[in-house]
Amino acid sequence: MRRPWTPSAGRFTFEGRAPARAAVQEAQMISRLAAGLTRHPAMAGAGLSLLSLPIHLVLPEAVSIPFAAVILGLVAGIYAGFALQDGRANILAIEGLAAVAFLALALAGLAWSPWFIPAAYALHGVWDLLHHRRISTAMPSWYPPMCAVYDWVFAAGLSALWILR
């Protein structure tokens, strides 16, 4: 079991290690995690999705639906951020239109039927694969497959949770 940083003999130690050594070991651990993400982005997406689904078990339906819609809006905005970083007008237009479309689906989920929200997540997974294959927005190569799997697992899991309520 890891212990937090504690004062010991006038200096800080972490599990008996000096601060510099502890910092190096922590950086190496983070580096290994990041390397795993780039080698296995689909597994990372599935894992992140499975980590984010349990909150919908404890949230009441009146909160779960808007929360999922807000996260969908944030997810859609990530690609707009990549487009802004990219700087090309055509990419910004494509990403901007897509973000507006996903925001519209999130709002439709709030206004008419919550089932628009998991459907939008599933469609966003398709959009992710289009990025991976067709759209040349500047972004990390691991991001589209990670996000696609996240979206599909989350859409399926959210649908299952809402059906079982």
Set out the residue ranges of the language-model regions.
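N-terminal membrane topogenic signal
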Residues: 29-45
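C-terminal ends of transmembrane helices
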Residues: 30-32, 77-90, 127-137
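Cytoplasmic-side transmembrane-helix entry/capping segments in multi-pass membrane proteins
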Residues: 41-42, 90-100, 142-148
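Membrane-embedded alpha-helical segments in integral membrane proteins
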Residues: 45-60, 74, 103, 158-159
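Structural signature of hydrophobic alpha-helical transmembrane segments
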Residues: 59-73, 112-122
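Membrane-helix boundary connector in multi-pass membrane proteins
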Residues: 111-122, 126-142
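Juxtamembrane boundary at the C-terminal end of a transmembrane helix
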Residues: 157-165
